């Protein structure tokens, strides 16, 4: 199978506590697409998070701006709820997908609105580290749906 699709995941995160699970799904996704995971965390974000939510969200946005390319999706609890089949349709036939996972304070409304789509994985507030792992599983599931693989039953 030819891997023409580029999938990018950008996350405000120091380290990956769910590394074993992330690696599992990253390997599975590689059968369908080239995957790039970038944990974005710098001194400005660390300082801003200690100031307030507004400054933190601004620092997240500044860190993410250079990566806005392809079909851009924000992970946001106020985003649209999709079934796995609907998500598979959403990402089907795209050349490049870029997913943005904010830090502890989420993302600014203006940033979310500047992207192509806002996706909610749950109405619950989830740890951003966990969101990334859950997103990887759903991306793999979507590829399986789109390729008639039995993983999704």
UniProtKB/Swiss-Prot annotation:
The gene is rlmH. It holds the Pfam family SPOUT_MTase. It catalyses: pseudouridine(1915) in 23S rRNA + S-adenosyl-L-methionine = N(3)-methylpseudouridine(1915) in 23S rRNA + S-adenosyl-L-homocysteine + H(+). GO terms for molecular function: rRNA (pseudouridine-N3-)-methyltransferase activity. Specifically methylates the pseudouridine at position 1915 (m3Psi1915) in 23S rRNA. PANTHER family: METHYLTRANSFERASE, RIBOSOMAL RNA LARGE SUBUNIT METHYLTRANSFERASE H. Belongs to the RNA methyltransferase RlmH family. It comes from Campylobacter jejuni (strain RM1221). It is found in: Cytoplasm. This is Ribosomal RNA large subunit methyltransferase H. InterPro entries: Alpha/beta_knot_MTases (IPR029028), RlmH-like (IPR003742), tRNA_m1G_MTases_N (IPR029026).
